[in-house]
Amino acid sequence: MRKQILLSLFLGIIFSFSVFAQGVKAEKIILPGGELNNLYKIDSGVYRSEQPSHAAFKALEEYGIGEVLNLRNRHSDDDEAAGTNVKLHRVKMKAHSVNEEQLIRALRIIKNRKTPIVIHCHHGSDRTGAVCAFYRIVYQNVSKEDAIREMTEGGFGFHRIYRNLIRKIKEADIEQVRKKVMADEEP
């Protein structure tokens, strides 16, 4: 009996460490109608996805999403969101040249949201991945390594050509980013 208890405790500890070692993992969300293939929940009220279609905007609104942050440089969500009450935000980014100011603006929008929000770019992988990695680090105190691992290996379709995003995370002074995000003035 005692051996069984000790074995159970040992296995429980090992399992806990293995889960902890896996780091962070976003929760896959499937909307009715399957409108989005790359939709994940990263925190309470914070989601990430690829570019939503008009039908996806309606499905997101029905799901309870009230705000959308578009990271695309040359595409607004005006047409896709037409006929919904979803509040649109936009921080124009190019995946090959994301800068700290853009990241801070995006993080402030997420911080100041009034309803659940979806963050997206075209595929929901690179620009969205960088913003979500910074979100994890700044707001959830996730390590840079775990945030990078989730961005690159989390099943979101990260494109290795954008290794600059990994460098951006590794080289970021997170305390300075955090201070700027929490400040009221523009970066």
Model segments located where?
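Bacterial N-terminal signal peptides
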Residues: 8-18
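Short cysteine clusters
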Residues: 121
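Bacterial N-terminal signal peptides that target proteins for export
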Residues: 1-9
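Cys-dependent protein tyrosine phosphatase-like superfamily
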Residues: 17-117, 131-187
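Ser/Thr-glycine-rich phosphate-binding loops at phosphate-binding pockets of nucleotides
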Residues: 128
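Substrate/cofactor-recognition hotspot
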Residues: 124
